[in-house]
Amino acid sequence: MASNSAFSLFLILLIITQCLSVLNAAKDFDFFYFVQQWPGSYCDTKQSCCYPTTGKPAADFGIHGLWPNNNDGTYPSNCDPNSPYDQSQISDLISSMQQNWPTLACPSGSGSTFWSHEWEKHGTCAESVLTNQHAYFKKALDLKNQIDLLSILQGADIHPDGESYDLVNIRNAIKSAIGYTPWIQCNVDQSGNSQLYQVYICVDGSGSSLIECPIFPGGKCGTSIEFPTF
């Protein structure tokens, strides 16, 4: 009788723990960073790059990730080891991902290793909102379609031509187009020149609306930065 009571208590505690886990997951982040990167700035660094097995990507910004983040600058990661990347769940998105979310890491790959990393590190932490892999990757693709950075910049006469542009003009061009302030991340080319690398745009915790970023990442750019060719 005592053993049955103990087992029942164990089950109750297990259920309570699981419920609390679900509640905590729902509160595990405050907003998303949606990050796009310029391939020319990835490839002209000292570490260089490798084109994916599908060939050289288009000269366009590519998705880096959709990352849950907290207002204090911390972020959750690797939240659900029971939800490994499963490409069969996103088979209808692969063609679009190869175009809009290409890998440039070496050695050359199809993109699956990159996408697996993004899902398992970041996507699993958004399951309370974007409930499965298809929803997560589709949301990122939809945001890419919504925020056409290259067209925005070219419309402001800012082109990937290897020339330098004022950082404030790049930031203002994007803000004028989307209504919110982006964060510009720079890296340096092989000659040590500061260049446009990644653009961070913030999305609310439901994944439905762009917002002003509650906090920006660290790092800084020069007042004038290159926009390299690709």
UniProtKB/Swiss-Prot annotation:
GO function terms (MF aspect): ribonuclease T2 activity; RNA binding; RNA endonuclease activity
CDD domains: RNase_T2_euk
Domain of life: Eukaryota
Signal peptide positions (record): 1-25
Disulfide bonds: 43-49, 50-106, 79-125, 186-221, 202-213
Cross-referenced Pfam families: Ribonuclease_T2
EC number: 4.6.1.19
Record's GO cellular component terms: extracellular region
Induction: By phosphate starvation.
Stored InterPro entries: Ribonuclease_T2_eukaryotic, RNase_T2-like, RNase_T2-like_sf, RNase_T2_His_AS_1, RNase_T2_His_AS_2
Active site: 64 (proton donor), 118, 122 (proton acceptor)
Catalytic reaction(s) noted: a ribonucleotidyl-ribonucleotide-RNA + H2O = a 3'-end 3'-phospho-ribonucleotide-RNA + a 5'-end dephospho-ribonucleoside-RNA + H(+)
EC primary class: lyase
Binding site for RNA: 37, 64, 114, 117-118, 121-122
Entry keyword Hydrolase: yes
Alphabetical GO biological process terms: RNA catabolic process
Keyword Oxidoreductase assigned: no
Subcellular location: Secreted, Extracellular space; Secreted, Cell wall
Keyword terms, alphabetized: Cell wall, Disulfide bond, Endonuclease, Hydrolase, Lyase, Nuclease, Secreted, Signal, Stress response
Function of the protein: Probably involved in plant phosphate-starvation rescue system.
Family, per entry: Belongs to the RNase T2 family.
Protein name in UniProt: Extracellular ribonuclease LE
Organism: Solanum lycopersicum
